[in-house]
From Swiss-Prot:
Lineage, uppermost ranks: Bacteria, Bacillati, Bacillota, Bacilli, Lactobacillales
PANTHER family, per the entry: C-1-TETRAHYDROFOLATE SYNTHASE, CYTOPLASMIC, C-1-TETRAHYDROFOLATE SYNTHASE, CYTOPLASMIC-RELATED
Species per Swiss-Prot/TrEMBL record: Streptococcus sanguinis (strain SK36)
Descriptive protein name: Bifunctional protein FolD
Pathway where this protein functions: One-carbon metabolism; tetrahydrofolate interconversion
Similarity-based family: Belongs to the tetrahydrofolate dehydrogenase/cyclohydrolase family.
Single GO term (MF): methenyltetrahydrofolate cyclohydrolase activity
Keyword terms of this UniProt record: Amino-acid biosynthesis, Histidine biosynthesis, Hydrolase, Methionine biosynthesis, Multifunctional enzyme, NADP, One-carbon metabolism, Oxidoreductase, Purine biosynthesis
One GO term (biological process): purine nucleotide biosynthetic process
Assembly mode: Homodimer.
Listed InterPro entries: Aminoacid_DH-like_N_sf, NAD(P)-bd_dom_sf, THF_DH/CycHdrlase, THF_DH/CycHdrlase_cat_dom, THF_DH/CycHdrlase_CS, THF_DH/CycHdrlase_NAD-bd_dom
Function summary: Catalyzes the oxidation of 5,10-methylenetetrahydrofolate to 5,10-methenyltetrahydrofolate and then the hydrolysis of 5,10-methenyltetrahydrofolate to 10-formyltetrahydrofolate.
Keyword Manganese: no
Gene3D superfamilies assigned to the protein according to its UniProt record, in alphabetical order: Leucine Dehydrogenase, chain A, domain 1, NAD(P)-binding Rossmann-like Domain
């Protein structure tokens, strides 16, 4: 039976350390990190995520602000607000909650955020730095997974890693971070031929395909480490991952649960990157 990776417990531990670091810097400088979250419309899931981010920022000792904009906000109005925060030195991190309403171009919005304040790590400049081996802002979910590997002493060098899912938010940056640790990485997706066969070769399997219970024990080698990034709802409204947890846990060596695995770490890494952006602003 697999050991369960306690993402919630690890996130709380790192959050406590972050609050201590913030308090020390405040004592030295009289300043704290500032994080603004911008949300457009009333998507219920977005509202939950935003509340969690706000709660986490306040727990870390940050100054936190949420800009709640109506659904009909124009793209120009949103870009203008982002530029206001770009120019304000009191705010070190800017998060725009996705998804945005259909009339707003996500890419234009992500491009508008100052790369130095892009704590989501989605700006093309930050993506380029990651791929060139000089990361500054890293997408928070892959960053959280790497922190899990470190905390649990999971060796990556020389290991075969398979990532299922090729999004810019998780799959691609995850593959690059694993490569940087000298893993041999295969990046797969829903159209990969013989996907289960490919996945079954993995020592490290990261699943971010967005399909509930997509990965069964037929995808998993005995003793593999399995990271489930999925967040889906079943027919009863229960939150489930991309991995069929009960059967995969019988053969994996370590596995993340859903909920309580990757999710809490994602928010903690957003806070860590806000802190780092604040530190860089003090040094510049």
């Amino acid at each position: 039976m697999a050991q369960i990776i306690d993402g919630r417990g690890l996130a709380e531990k790192l959050q406590k350390k972050l609050a201590e670091k913030t308090a020390r810097l405040k004592e030295k400088t009289g300043q704290v990190p500032g994080l603004v979250v911008i949300v457009v419309g009333n998507n219920p899931a977005s509202q939950i995520y935003v509340r969690n981010k706000e709660r986490s920022a306040l727990a870390a000792g940050f100054r936190s602000k949420v800009e709640r904009l109506p659904e009909e906000t124009s793209q120009e109005e949103l870009l203008s607000l982002i530029e206001t925060y770009n120019q304000n030195p009191d705010w070190h991190g800017i998060l725009v909650q996705l998804p945005l309403p259909e009339h707003i171009d996500d890419e234009a919005v992500l491009l508008a955020i100052d790369p130095d304040k892009d704590v989501d790590g989605f700006h093309p400049l930050n993506m380029g730095k990651l791929w060139s081996g000089h990361p500054v802002m890293i997408p928070a979910t892959p960053a959280g997974i790497m922190a899990m590997f470190h905390e649990y002493g999971i060796e990556l060098e020389g290991k075969r890693a398979v990532v299922i899912g090729r999004s810019n938010i998780v799959g691609k940056p995850m593959a690059q971070l694993l490569l940087a640790k000298n893993a041999t990485v295969t990046l797969t997706h829903s159209r990969t031929h013989n996907l289960a066969k490919t996945a079954k070769r993995a020592d490290i399997l990261v699943v971010a395909i967005g399909r509930g219970h997509f990965v069964t024990k037929n995808f998993v080698k005995e003793g593999a480490v399995v990271i489930d990034v999925g967040m889906n709802r079943d027919e009863n409204g229960k939150l489930i991952g991309d991995v069929k947890f009960d059967e995969v846990a019988e053969i994996a060596s370590l596995i993340t649960p859903v909920p309580g695995g990757v999710g809490p770490m994602t928010i903690t890494m957003l806070m860590e990157q806000t802190y780092q952006a604040f530190k860089r602003s003090l040094e510049s």
